[in-house]
């Protein structure tokens, strides 16, 4: 490409060629330069002059009527001038009127009156007997106050049940210590339940309810194992390329024997059979360990160590606790010998034990008091 093609000449509006080597600060006339009409007509560089609209304006000089565009908002019967200055744009209550809230309050009052009418109608339909109402009038009470929990009903039952034992008494008499939860501020027995995430005391299941819950869990576990087995078989058939059995892969067959609600008797028998199998396997494992390592003679308790307190009897009843409810010793108590009125060890003096009745320190000696 030649140099002439690179630098093509430029022409102004009058058709004269523009010299590209003249700098801009020389060719361009500043905006503050006073121009005359003759200069404008003879100016061959007028196309490079700054536009009048782009020239800087002197705002210190008042210019009435320019740039004024007032906007008004008509609300109701008044005209409000719309002024969006810095503060009004950031005012959260700008344009708020109290009349809007009055309309909302009126709507709420209408809804409240409708509810009150329906409530009064239901109260009139389910009113109490005349004798009960007359008695309330004599006592200076109103049935509406009682229903709204403003006053206590004097005719309400106030006698406590005999079997209603306070929780603090149960905690004192029980072997477990009082358990206080500082988060929920509840004093509960942890053996009877627990406090959940919603700050509610949930009782543990006992008796028939616990057995039913265990049976339901057993049914769920059996159903889960069967589903896993079906999925494994379907995956193996897919790998081997075998076709599904009759009914197709989309047909789902439910085993009613694994449903607690459909067949509870069968589920109970299965659970019992499963428990017997586990117990048999446990006993077999235990016997194998004993046969391998020995020590079977220590598994069965000897008669010499079977509850020594039960062998110590007075008459036909075993002596386990005294009259105060305290646990007795394994040795005989209140068994006076050699005409003593106290037992050996009831007296101590000079580092020696003795009898409290005669102050003797020789054991199995006859009492000298009588």
UniProtKB/Swiss-Prot annotation:
InterPro entries: Slu7_dom, Splicing_factor_SLU7. The keyword Nucleus applies. It holds the Pfam family Slu7. Keywords: mRNA processing, mRNA splicing, Nucleus, Spliceosome. One of its GO terms (biological process) is mRNA splicing, via spliceosome. Associated with the spliceosome. Involved in pre-mRNA splicing. Belongs to the SLU7 family. This is Pre-mRNA-splicing factor SLU7. It comes from Debaryomyces hansenii (strain ATCC 36239 / CBS 767 / BCRC 21394 / JCM 1990 / NBRC 0083 / IGC 2968) (Yeast).
């Amino acid at each position: 490409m030649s140099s002439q093609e690179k630098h093509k000449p430029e022409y102004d509006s009058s058709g004269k060629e523009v010299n590209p080597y003249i700098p801009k600060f020389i060719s361009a006339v500043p905006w503050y330069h006073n121009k005359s009409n003759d200069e404008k007509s003879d100016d061959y560089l007028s196309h490079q002059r700054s536009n009048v609209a782009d020239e800087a304006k002197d705002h210190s000089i008042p210019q009435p009527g320019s740039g004024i565009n007032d906007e008004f908002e008509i609300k109701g019967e008044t005209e409000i001038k719309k002024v969006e200055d810095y503060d009004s744009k950031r005012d959260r209550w700008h344009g708020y009127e109290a009349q809007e809230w009055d309309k909302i309050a009126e709507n709420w009052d209408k809804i409240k009156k409708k509810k009150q009418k329906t409530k009064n109608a239901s109260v009139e339909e389910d009113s109490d007997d005349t004798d009960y109402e007359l008695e309330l009038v004599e006592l200076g009470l109103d049935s509406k106050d009682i229903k709204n929990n403003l006053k206590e009903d004097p005719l309400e039952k106030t006698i406590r049940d005999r079997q209603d034992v306070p929780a603090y008494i149960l905690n004192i008499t029980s072997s477990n210590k009082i358990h206080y939860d500082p988060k929920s501020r509840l004093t509960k027995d942890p053996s009877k339940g627990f406090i959940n995430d919603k700050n509610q005391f949930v009782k543990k299941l006992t008796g028939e309810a616990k057995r039913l819950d265990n049976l339901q869990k057993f049914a769920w576990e059996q159903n889960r194992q069967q589903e896993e087995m079906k999925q494994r078989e379907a995956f193996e058939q897919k790998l081997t390329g075998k076709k599904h059995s009759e009914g197709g892969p989309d047909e789902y067959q439910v085993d009613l024997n694994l449903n607690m609600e459909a067949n509870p008797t069968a589920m109970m028998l299965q659970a019992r059979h499963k428990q017997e199998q586990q117990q048999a396997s446990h006993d077999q494992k235990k016997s194998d360990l004993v046969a391998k390592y020995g020590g079977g003679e220590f598994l069965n308790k000897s008669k010499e160590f079977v509850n020594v307190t039960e062998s110590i009897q007075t008459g036909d009843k075993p002596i386990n606790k005294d009259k105060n409810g305290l646990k007795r010793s394994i040795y005989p108590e209140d068994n006076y010998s050699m005409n003593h009125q106290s037992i050996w060890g009831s007296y101590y003096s000079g580092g020696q034990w003795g009898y409290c009745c005669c102050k003797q320190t020789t054991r199995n000696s006859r009492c000298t008091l009588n």
